[in-house]
């Protein structure tokens, strides 16, 4: 059997699966779609994160594929229905990066509150020492709205309560006792937008949530409210968010995701994904690093190893 690894994952995966099969790691991580199609023909196990998209073309090229191990949570980049039709089992790692993503959410919320990034630039680039230019606000006493109150959303709320924040949340799929257990008030999206000082998004990207955060929902928010997005870029309409930031209709937007994310060396317009948000003040972005901790990588790696071994009956 053959295993192909196409992204940076826990070294333990190659080490353990190498006891049962030939394991190869692509030179370019992740490869392009065409490169993957050219090299996947005799592969039994594919280990990946989110790039490239595994669509019908890729799956048709994968004549021997039996298992796809996804070292992340979302599966919107994989045609899971067609994979199932072809008998390919797909495993992801729900919940195992939850604490890492939650901590990054709090990190960005603190940064937006205390303006540490522009303050750093002002000192190191402009060579100024103006502490009065960066007056912030405390999290204590503020309201945090959580859109999507699953494992990650609940963990964010748990940490935020330590700062003295009030938690309100939207999740139509959860029973009332979950909100009560987590000391959160259940509200509609409109209500969350209206009362929150900070709103954090932890939803999957699907037809129901795409462009969920748009001009209408932004208009319902406080003018100094901050939006945090550690989920998927397509949930936030970037054009509407950019216009709101430039018009002063929102306090800030901090995200770990973009509507168009591509692999490559640098953020250039030629790369095909330059967002209008890049020209906005009060905007902070990171390159989808929510799960990028050694701790999460270790836990996810162990989970994927077990799933692959179970699927292929490897003892």
What positions do the PLM features span?
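Rossmann-like dinucleotide/phosphate-binding beta-alpha-beta segment
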Residues: 19, 132-223
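Phosphate-binding beta-alpha-beta segment of Rossmann-like dinucleotide-binding domains, i.e.
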Residues: 86-88, 94-143, 158, 162
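An N-terminal-biased, well-structured beta-alpha scaffold segment characteristic
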Residues: 1-91, 214
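Glycine-rich nucleotide-phosphate-binding loops and adjacent flexible coil segments
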Residues: 228
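Rossmann-like dinucleotide-binding domain for NAD(H)/NADP(H)
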Residues: 90, 224, 232-315
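Short glycine-/small-residue-rich Rossmann-like dinucleotide-binding loops
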Residues: 51, 73, 197, 203-205, ...
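Short beta->alpha connector loops at strand-helix junctions that form conserved
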Residues: 26-29, 71-72, 88-99, 171, ...
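An anion/phosphate-binding loop that grips the pyrophosphate of nucleotide cofactors and donors
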Residues: 43, 62, 195-196, 224
